[in-house]
Design a protein with these regions (language model features):
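Short aromatic-rich membrane-water interface segments that cap or initiate transmembrane helices
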Residues: 53-55, 148-159
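Juxtamembrane helix-capping/reentrant segments at transmembrane boundaries
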Residues: 42-56, 111-124, 294, 299
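Membrane-interface helix termini and inter-helical loops of multi-pass transporters
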Residues: 2, 78-81, 108-109, 140-152
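Internal, non-catalytic "lid/hinge" segments that mediate substrate recognition, gating
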Residues: 116-117, 127-141
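Alpha-helical transmembrane segments
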Residues: 2-33, 63-101, 132, 137-138, ...
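Membrane-interface loops
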Residues: 29-46
Length: 329
């Protein structure tokens, strides 16, 4: 396919994702307010966040629904092919969105932040990850970790299933942990998906690239409502879906190592939580003022918008490195 035609498809994909999210946001946010689907704010995050109490959650639907509908439209109109890989991605995206939606719904029903228990959520995530692994292997998926230019070829055999499960569950929870400031997780996800869109197209996964361009456009549309001051939060509905599909795209395009670079900010946020727990148990004191890391900066007196801008810039720089790594290495 010519580069110009591919570019046209990519631009169109971003546009329909963006417009779909903007329109749905206009309709959905008032409906969520009417239904009193408001986020309850933890007492531990400080007074700056208390004013956000009651902001509608489940806003992930604003980018999930347009992404699914636009992708189906592109398939029906034969602009992209419904390959097994794309089908798997859609199932993962929808499945993890459902887990998040269920968690958000139960949190609202109980009138606290306790939706699904940690075990329930983890079991559902693992169940979908196992389904992903089954479909991946049935479709002739490789079980080796490969970075061709560096001469890395590690045959993992059955252990690749554990590795895959770790990527999917880990990525979904990493985005979930990062979703603590207005626009933070949404902006970082949009930046990461731009990278995976370009990488997918360049290495021959056109249908995955177009899907991620649609999702990128929808995230830009969502950010109109989620950037500071947020009119809506994505909730677990959005964060779990974003992380899982990011992991799925990395696996299906054989860019698992690239994911570590492109999603470095998410990784750092998650590591800050792990290190904090380790430090508390080992040395009986905190390593950070508060985790995830963005809350540490808040405790240092940084403004919310300044933290988000810093994290976006770091994410953008690392994503550019990730594109180079993902295409040429």
């Amino acid at each position: 396919m010519s580069g110009m035609l591919l570019l046209t498809k990519a631009v169109f994909a971003i546009m329909i994702g963006f417009l779909g999210a903007v329109v749905l946001g206009l309709l959905l946010i008032p409906a969520l307010k009417k239904l009193k689907v408001g986020q309850r704010i933890s007492i531990f995050v400080g007074d700056n966040h208390k004013k956000k109490e009651g902001t509608p959650t489940m806003g992930g639907l604003i980018f999930i629904i347009p992404t699914l509908l636009a992708t189906l439209l592109l398939i029906v109109t034969k602009k992209i092919e419904l390959t097994t890989n794309l089908g798997i991605i859609l199932l993962v995206f929808t499945g993890y969105a459902f887990i998040g939606f269920l968690d958000d719904y139960l949190s609202l029903k109980k009138k606290n932040n306790e939706g699904l228990t940690t075990i329930q959520k983890l079991l559902l995530q693992v169940l979908i990850a196992l389904g992903f692994f089954y479909l991946y292997m049935k479709n002739g998926g490789q079980t080796a970790l490969i970075v061709s230019t560096l001469g890395i070829h590690i045959e993992m055999s059955w252990f690749y299933g554990v590795f895959l499960l770790f990527i999917l569950v880990g990525a979904s929870n990493a985005v979930n942990l990062t979703d603590g400031l207005d626009g933070l997780a949404g902006g970082l996800s949009a930046i990461a998906f731009i990278a995976f869109s370009l990488i997918s197209l360049m290495v021959g996964f056109e249908e995955i690239g177009i899907f991620t361009f649609v999702l990128t456009g929808a995230l830009f549309g969502f950010l109109i409502y989620n950037a500071y001051p947020a009119k809506v939060f994505m909730g677990d509905t959005g964060s779990l879906a974003l992380g899982a599909v990011m992991g799925a795209v990395a696996i299906l395009t054989h860019r698992e190592v690239t994911l570590l670079v492109v999603a470095s900010v998410f990784v750092i946020e998650t590591l800050s939580v792990i290190l904090q727990v380790f430090w508390l148990f080992t040395f009986k004191k905190k390593l950070f003022l508060m985790t995830p890391l963005h809350h540490h900066f808040e405790k240092l007196g940084w403004g919310e918008q300044d933290i988000v801008k810093l994290f976006w810039v770091v994410g953008l720089i690392l994503t550019m490195a990730g594109i180079f790594f993902g295409v040429w290495l």
